[in-house]
């Protein structure tokens, strides 16, 4: 795998000089690093691009940024956020098209504002709703192809840049060579998110050692105890605690938290590493709906479906929850209802493959 990564990186460096690398927002000045400039190394379900190309090998990133306006942001707050489920889905008569539209809105609004809440929404859409449609059994359909295209487009917002430095928005095993008018560097992100919480980022390829740069890493709402929309969802289990950021094995002291991002501002040397261990224990969440309540299960950005479909969302689910791994090393959640019956829950994206 290590040799494969090195060979792929060499190919990436050769091809990047021939292709346009960024998609820019005119508002904040953020530029997304284009999907074609990012090599995704994940295996199985964490490899969003690989899953998408399994549907259609000809898929390439499309231009999905919408014209930004204050009206678009107001529409998001008024019409999108109140309808969001823990899966990121809003439902409706055409849930996949709605999800694709919401992903485009989230990408646009993040590029214009730099607020992590929009990448939180994109992450949930990608790993729950859209991945579920791609994984679903049965012949290829229009919705499956549409969802696959959206997964490819989603890999075009893993990284972004501005005049100050690098933004790491999504935690996906990947490598990219970032080249802007202000700086150049190679970013190697090593992780098995969203199944395991460790994220290691190695920076190389800077013009020199001691190169000053700001690196922003998203601290997701699901790790800071912020459920969206607020007032609709409440943690029953103890909410996760934001992890410590380590630089070269030492706690990062020169960090600032702003807009849902940890900002590490320092002079970087080639080979410097950032390490974060995100807590990914399963949590019970109370969901207020129609004057009543139900109980759901989340683990990081993943929404979970209970094997007993008749009991999904049943308020009688009781803690504590336990985690186990299946034959494919996917995290399953086990627990009991208040009446003592046992249940098993699996990631929502697998619930359409039965």
Annotated model-derived regions:
Residues 23-40, 69, 119-209, 224-244, ...:
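C-terminal beta-rich recognition modules with glycine/proline-rich loops and embedded aromatic residues
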């Amino acid at each position: 795998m290590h040799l494969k990564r090195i060979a792929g990186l060499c190919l990436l460096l050769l091809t990047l000089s021939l292709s346009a690398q960024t998609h820019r927002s005119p508002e904040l000045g953020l530029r997304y690093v284009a999907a074609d400039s990012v090599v995704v190394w994940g295996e199985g379900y964490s490899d969003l691009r690989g899953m998408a190309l399994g549907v259609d090998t000809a898929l390439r990133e499309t231009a999905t940024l919408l014209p930004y306006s204050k009206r678009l942001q107001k529409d998001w707050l008024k019409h999108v956020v109140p309808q969001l489920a823990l899966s990121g889905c809003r439902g409706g008569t055409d849930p996949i098209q709605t999800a694709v539209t919401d992903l485009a809105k989230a990408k646009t609004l993040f590029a214009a504002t730099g607020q992590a809440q929009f990448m939180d929404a994109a992450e949930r859409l990608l790993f729950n709703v859209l991945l579920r449609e791609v994984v679903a059994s049965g012949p290829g359909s229009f919705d499956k192809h549409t969802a696959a295209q959206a997964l490819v487009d989603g890999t075009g917002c893993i990284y972004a840049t501005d005049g100050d430095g690098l933004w790491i928005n999504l935690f996906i095993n990947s490598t990219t060579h970032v080249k802007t008018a202000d700086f150049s560097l190679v970013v190697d992100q090593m992780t098995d998110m969203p199944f395991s919480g460790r994220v290691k980022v190695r920076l190389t390829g800077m013009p020199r050692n001691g190169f000053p740069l700001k690196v922003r890493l998203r601290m997701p709402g699901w790790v800071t105890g912020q459920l969206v929309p607020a007032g609709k969802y409440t943690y029953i289990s103890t909410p996760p605690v934001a992890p410590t950021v380590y630089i070269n094995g030492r706690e990062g002291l020169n960090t600032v938290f702003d807009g849902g991002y940890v900002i590490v501002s320092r002079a970087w040397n080639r080979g410097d590493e950032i390490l974060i261990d995100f807590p990914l224990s399963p949590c019970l969440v109370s969901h207020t709906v129609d004057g009543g309540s139900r109980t759901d299960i989340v683990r990081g950005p993943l929404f979970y479906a209970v094997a007993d479909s008749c009991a999904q969302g049943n308020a009688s689910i009781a803690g504590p929850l336990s985690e186990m791994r299946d034959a494919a090393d996917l995290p399953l959640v086990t627990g009991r209802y208040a009446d003592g019956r046992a249940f098993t829950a699996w990631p929502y994206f697998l619930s359409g493959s039965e």
